[in-house]
Swiss-Prot record:
Gene Ontology terms: cellular component: cell outer membrane; cell surface
Keywords: Cell outer membrane, Lipoprotein, Membrane, Palmitate, Plasmid, Signal
GN (gene name): ospA
Subcellular location: Cell outer membrane; Cell surface
Family annotation (Pfam families): Lipoprotein_1 (PF00820)
SUPFAM superfamilies: Outer surface protein
Membrane topology classification: Lipid-anchor
Family listed: Belongs to the OspA lipoprotein family.
Name of the molecule in the record: Outer surface protein A
Gene3D superfamilies: 3.90.930.1, C1 set domains (antibody constant domain-like)
Phylogenetic placement of the source organism: Bacteria, Pseudomonadati, Spirochaetota, Spirochaetia, Spirochaetales
Lipidation (S-diacylglycerol cysteine): 17
Amino acid sequence: MKKYLLGIGLILALIACKQNVSSLDEKNSASVDLPGEMKVLVSKEKDKDGKYSLKATVDKIELKGTSDKDNGSGVLEGTKDDKSKAKLTIADDLSKTTFELFKEDGKTLVSRKVSSKDKTSTDEMFNEKGELSAKTMTRENGTKLEYTEMKSDGTGKAKEVLKNFTLEGKVANDKVTLEVKEGTVTLSKEIAKSGEVTVALNDTNTTQATKKTGAWDSKTSTLTISVNSKKTTQLVFTKQDTITVQKYDSAGTNLEGTAVEIKTLDELKNALK
């Protein structure tokens, strides 16, 4: 009789372990906040394999997994109604989450979102072949860098969405070139894969007396515009992803007044006149 009861108890214990993930609730688990406004439930006790159970719901998809740690890190997986697969990877230090959607084969990517603790994120969309077709990188301050109409060679359209206006251009191999044109003047802003910014000015005007030139100082992120070797305007591309403008005096030697933030694309074009 004792052996029978022990056997029943063992079976019930094994069933409880197997059901650990699906039965997670407020009583037997702890809720952990994650980057990307996500939450994961972590079991308070280990299962029969010595693992902690994980459970999360993302975009109405129930995800389950296990982990050696009890802090919420690990890999969770689930299946949508259309049989496509979902995967959530939580970094060991909880600093980053990666949420991926795959086709039914579980290999061909449909979309991917990487969210970091510093409020930055990267959203990627993929075509039928699993190739990158669009990408949006959101910075900590809310400004964005967007790639669209991406081709297999890494080229496509680019757009930088600033606080008050947008700059447009192209991307090639993760190097972005944005342009603003006003008359014969073209302002070019290049953003390298590392995030380093370089700004240049080109003027097709053939009259030397009115031809504009630009000198870029990478240390201060400043573009100084001159006409016939005389400084006229200073544009500063700040770390907050804003642009300020300040004029020089008639002699071109000293800056006048204070720097003013450019809030519209027309204001930026006016600074190039």
